[in-house]
């Protein structure tokens, strides 16, 4: 098992990665101080049907263990489910010494983490990711639910006690979820580990290569990129915004197409391509955009939909959390491994989006 140490101003914890990582969960809980009183597992229907019993069986503890299961899908990261989770916690007599376990992908990690952050003004939680995408969201303490007007608009910063990445859980993922998570791996490589980027181009020819030792290698290289940034900027006052590379357009596409109609990773992949397309114009540099586009298409990432209204996308991009005083701020790339947050006028974004949309046809 590989261990990755995460250090922030508010907390230090470890990410445990491996084929036997789940066996470490009981020991982690037994070492917690103050002692854990009882345990609430939050999951979704798809994950629960596959892995909930495995997780419960792995918890060889004396404490009461109960579960709260929501329907699957990004749209379930809602205030209604957040409220119902609190109701379940109260009915089952959770207290300030209780523990919440987030068993699932990024949606569950965000929802369960925000429940933990707000229940009795904050209790402990552990992330047990079941998707590749969650290698990003499970680390760093950003937890949130969606609002009809925007993604992740209601939330908090609340670090987990630990992240337990039991890689066999990923074996049940459909291809679209492998692709979605791999987009965030590519993002981490592009912004913070150029050596990993070149390794991916050589070693991951198809999504089926994301297995076994290669999967563990990818996780142990991509997670430290985020860990390094979070250690310097826990609450996104500066360089943590670099982790939003590709997300300004990506989130706009998710909102416009409807949560669940495009995966987060597919949206981010299109967003990264657009960011590189625009970066070449802004910085007058050659980032091999055309080569990158073909590389993305090889994995099955979508093209920019040709029928989307560009002005509508511009307005949605202005609702992004990085926007300031109604001005779009995007993470752009000067070179591989070197990104910055840049303010961009509506007109510039509109013109670039139209050109990008035509280029992707």
UniProtKB/Swiss-Prot annotation:
Report the locations given in the UniProt record.
Cytoplasm
Q: How is the cofactor bound?
A: Binds 1 divalent metal cation per subunit. Can use either Co(2+) or Zn(2+).
Q: Which reaction does it catalyse?
A: 7-phospho-2-dehydro-3-deoxy-D-arabino-heptonate = 3-dehydroquinate + phosphate
Which EC class does it fall in? lyase
The record, for InterPro entries, names: Dehydroquinate_synthase (IPR050071), DHQ_synth_AroB (IPR016037), DHQ_synth_fam (IPR030963), DHQS/DOIS_N (IPR030960), DHQS_C (IPR056179)
Q: Which cofactor does it need?
A: Co(2+); Zn(2+); NAD(+)
What residue ranges carry the coiled-coil annotation? none
* Gene Ontology terms for molecular function: 3-dehydroquinate synthase activity; metal ion binding; nucleotide binding
Which pathway is it part of? Metabolic intermediate biosynthesis; chorismate biosynthesis; chorismate from D-erythrose 4-phosphate and phosphoenolpyruvate: step 2/7
Keywords from the UniProt entry: Amino-acid biosynthesis, Aromatic amino acid biosynthesis, Cobalt, Cytoplasm, Lyase, Metal-binding, NAD, Nucleotide-binding, Zinc
- Reply yes or no: does the keyword Metal-binding apply: yes
Biological process annotations from GO: amino acid biosynthetic process; aromatic amino acid family biosynthetic process; chorismate biosynthetic process
> Which residues take part in binding NAD(+)?
72-77, 130-131, 142, 151
Q: Which residues hold Zn(2+)?
A: 184, 247, 264
- One CC-aspect GO term: cytoplasm
Task: Return the EC number.
Answer: 4.2.3.4
Q: What does this protein do?
A: Catalyzes the conversion of 3-deoxy-D-arabino-heptulosonate 7-phosphate (DAHP) to dehydroquinate (DHQ).
The family annotation for this protein states: Belongs to the sugar phosphate cyclases superfamily. Dehydroquinate synthase family.
Q: Which HAMAP family match?
A: DHQ_synthase (MF_00110)
The name of this protein is: 3-dehydroquinate synthase
| Organism annotation | Bacillus mycoides (strain KBAB4)
Name the encoding gene, please.
aroB
